[in-house]
Amino acid sequence: MSEQKVVICKDLKSELQDFLSSLKYDKLFILMDTNTKEKCFPLVEDIPAFQKAPILVMEAGDMNKGFVSLAQIWTALSNEGASRNSLLVNLGGGMITDMGGFAGATFKRGIRTINIPTTLMASVDAAVGGKTGINFNGLKNEVGSFYPPLCVFIDCDFLRTLDRDNILSGYAEMIKHGLISSMENYASVMLFDIDTMNYSYLNSLVGQSVAVKERIVEEDPKEQGIRKALNFGHTIGHAFESLSFLKMRPILHGHAVAAGIVSELYLSHKLCGFPMEKLSQVVYYIKEYYPALFFDCTDYDTLYELMTHDKKNEGGIINFTLLKNVGDVRINQSVTKEKILESLDFYRESFGI
């Protein structure tokens, strides 16, 4: 898998234009969703390389990250004369960078892509690392590929277009990055007050978070080992997210991950000795900012069944990434159903559900 370049921009338009000018391509396409077109595209639409570029606009929302939308992208690329020498720019949040990346990976067996994330979630997670995919059969990112973009351009000015819920969604991944990396990173993440929104401090945290993911992906690009650290909070988190879709009450990915972090820290404490003091600190922080996820014991079997479809599983065994301490990651941890259900109890008790 080729190495990707990540640029934390000081002047997005100038840096992006310079990069595009250095490339040879026959046609450039821009993929975005309805939200991005309204709030973000006006910030970059006057870039010279974007003039006359066909624009592909998808309906916003993760429920649209499926095969129907993917086929629409393929059809548009085909109808507009895209070739293997074309370039697809994915301007948007995780839904766009995931699906656009997969469209790029598969159209004519692969065309080059560039990611310009416009959400916090995409900036620190979805757009970086080369994972692409779509939801399928009610499961998150069930079909996809490892296909890194040529470059990821991160401009934190886009974050000012986001509402609080979307900031929270992305910040859950930053909490995860703090927990799996170092005490220094963890402490800085825990200090951020989301309600006061110091964008300058947030920008520095974004750079720190991206560096954590870049380091891990460079070491293990195809998730054979340590890259599984990035799945912390996601085994249960993805189950929460999938359950919300089944109930037709979809929640943002990061809100599900935050809940997954709470449950998986409980498992980390019980099975790996993660310190209770730090567990309590993280639970307090997440309770302070994140809405509670409402579910009860009648949902447990469904949640467990959803976990059995997790991509990290091997031989029918649910594999977790757990922590012995901040920065001390234990991958490929098998957990009994009893303990998993206990962790769901712990979440509900912590949030008074």
Curated annotation (Swiss-Prot):
Principal location: cytoplasm
Superkingdom of the organism of origin: Bacteria
Name of the top EC class for this enzyme: lyase
Subcellular location: Cytoplasm
Cofactor, how bound (note): Binds 1 divalent metal cation per subunit. Can use either Co(2+) or Zn(2+).
Keyword Zinc-finger recorded: no
Pathway(s) this gene product operates in, as recorded in its UniProt entry: Metabolic intermediate biosynthesis; chorismate biosynthesis; chorismate from D-erythrose 4-phosphate and phosphoenolpyruvate: step 2/7
Catalytic activities: 7-phospho-2-dehydro-3-deoxy-D-arabino-heptonate = 3-dehydroquinate + phosphate
Function: Catalyzes the conversion of 3-deoxy-D-arabino-heptulosonate 7-phosphate (DAHP) to dehydroquinate (DHQ).
Organism: Parabacteroides distasonis (strain ATCC 8503 / DSM 20701 / CIP 104284 / JCM 5825 / NCTC 11152)
Cofactor: NAD(+); Co(2+); Zn(2+)
Keywords noted in UniProt: Amino-acid biosynthesis, Aromatic amino acid biosynthesis, Cobalt, Cytoplasm, Lyase, Metal-binding, NAD, Nucleotide-binding, Zinc
Binding site for NAD(+): 60-65, 94-98, 118-119, 131, 140
Residues given in the record as Zn(2+) binding sites: E173, H234, H253
A GO term, aspect molecular function: 3-dehydroquinate synthase activity
A GO BP annotation: chorismate biosynthetic process
GO CC annotation: cytoplasm
EC number: 4.2.3.4
Name of the protein described by the UniProt record: 3-dehydroquinate synthase
Entry annotated with the keyword Nucleotide-binding: yes
Family: Belongs to the sugar phosphate cyclases superfamily. Dehydroquinate synthase family.
Listed SUPFAM superfamilies: Dehydroquinate synthase-like
InterPro entries: Dehydroquinate_synthase, DHQ_synth_AroB, DHQ_synth_fam, DHQS/DOIS_N, DHQS_C
